[in-house]
């Protein structure tokens, strides 16, 4: 299967409610040309180095000079020095500089506007792209945000938090341990929503097919 066919298949599956888009940090970092234009947010490696430099945390490198220290590990050590609120505000401040300016990947996805998009990113690039396209997109940060949300309304599930709530982002080792417990409920609701969404789509297709066959039957002599 070539790339073009893969893209067509993916688009079909999204339209049919069989696939969910997941955006990792790579989606918000941007291409080389976009980075040259000053667009995109910091990569995890860049953010790791920024935290280490600002809070005086030593970094570890392998024999080839590659960074071994992780964002989670460095952030955890920084929190021991200055506290979680200070470190998280610093992280979001560095992220904000790249917010509000969607990249090509976000604008392309907004044209498709799948019902559910999931991400571990803190930024608002996809939501902004949806706004620019004149489309509504509800930001889901916790399970309570799903209450009363219409089934077919586009939503962005922010699995690790959002820049508008800096103190609640998942960043350190202890954050992720607690998140695993909290996320179980959200994941269960997402799965249920997906199953319901697929069932509704199938029911709609069945109704259309039944209507078509009924019309064909009535036309028969």
Question: Where are the regions a protein language model picked out?
Answer:
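Conserved catalytic alpha/beta core of Sir2/sirtuin-type deacylases, generalized to analogous enzyme cores
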Residues: 1-19, 101-102, 107, 111-221
